[in-house]
């Protein structure tokens, strides 16, 4: 399913982290979302 960040990301960070950690969300897009929202991913 397609997602529409950053609004949806702000509403459900946990879901996005699960998607990201499962490798279903491109790293470059995740980096953009993080920069837009100020959210930091743990290494």
From Swiss-Prot:
Keywords: Disulfide bond, Protease inhibitor, Serine protease inhibitor. It comes from the Eukaryota. GO terms for molecular function: serine-type endopeptidase inhibitor activity. Heterodimer of an A chain and a B chain, linked by a disulfide bond. Inhibitor of chymotrypsin. Belongs to the protease inhibitor I13 (potato type I serine protease inhibitor) family. This is Cytin chain A. It comes from Theromyzon tessulatum (Duck leech).
